[in-house]
């Protein structure tokens, strides 16, 4: 890493990962965007999924590529002597992957679990290590994202002609550690304030699967149980004949290709 180091400040991006070439291209663009936005900072990308790391290395769907987990990168960052460290999650909502980043990788680094760093260096990092939250960490983030999505030219054109559905990932039951699933409902609510043709579904959050979105389009009152919270949404019957699907994920990887784009699945119906 010392050969790559240009600054004493570093941003470590953490994504779940992927095994799709288009996703790798997007990750490269994300890294470039961060470098452009935060000049004077070094920027690196890590994958938190061992499966994605191993499959990328084996060349599944693409030429072999080397990616490393956050522990590998944080160790290298510490050994390189960086003085300001930002670990930025690329997740959409807080869930299992974000919890692992914050409560495992970063915590182990700050506790010098493996004894890789001197006490002097660790003391120098006091208040100099920051963990960036996911895209929709707070409800206000969902509101801001709704406005941003609605301002996208292709989305604005599509929703003016018919249904627009965003497909997120969601936390499966038992893994919604921070109540992050509620953000999808809040996002949908804010989007529908802008245009009732908007819908939000997921691949893993109960009551927001593809078949649930179809029922929402048919209209009715729906109660969502999210942890200890109840959330109610009212939908009018939508008779639109056109529809457009968009992935609500940091990259278009396996879910976008095999869940959303599969003609045999409801998300593509």
Regions found by a protein language model. Give the residues of each.
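Active-site-proximal alpha-helix that buttresses catalytic centers in soluble enzyme cores
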Residues: 1-269
């Amino acid at each position: 890493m010392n050969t790559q180091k240009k600054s004493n400040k570093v941003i470590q991006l953490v994504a779940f990962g992927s095994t799709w070439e288009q996703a790798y291209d997007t990750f490269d663009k994300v890294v470039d965007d961060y470098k452009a936005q935060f000049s004077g900072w070094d920027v690196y990308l890590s994958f938190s999924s061992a499966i994605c790391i191993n499959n990328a290395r084996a060349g599944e769907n693409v030429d072999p590529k080397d990616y490393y987990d956050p522990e590998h990168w944080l160790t290298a960052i510490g050994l390189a002597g960086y003085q300001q460290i930002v670990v930025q999650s690329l997740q959409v909502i807080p869930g299992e992957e974000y919890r692992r980043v914050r409560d495992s990788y970063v915590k182990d680094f700050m506790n010098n679990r493996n004894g890789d760093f001197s006490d002097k260096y660790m003391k120098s990092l006091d208040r100099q290590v920051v963990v960036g939250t996911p895209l929709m960490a707070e409800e206000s983030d969902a509101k801001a994202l709704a406005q941003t999505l609605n301002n996208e030219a292709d989305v604005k054109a599509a929703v003016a002609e018919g249904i627009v559905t965003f497909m997120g990932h969601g936390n499966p039951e038992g893994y919604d550690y921070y109540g992050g699933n509620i953000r999808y409902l809040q996002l949908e609510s804010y989007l529908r304030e802008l245009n009732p043709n908007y819908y939000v579904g997921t691949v893993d959050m109960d009551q927001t699967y593809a078949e649930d979105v179809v029922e929402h389009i048919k209209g009715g009152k729906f109660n969502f149980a999210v942890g200890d919270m109840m959330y109610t949404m009212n939908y009018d019957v939508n008779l639109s004949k056109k529809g457009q699907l968009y992935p609500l994920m940091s990259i278009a990887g396996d879910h976008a290709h095999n869940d959303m784009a599969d003609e045999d699945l409801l998300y593509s119906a």
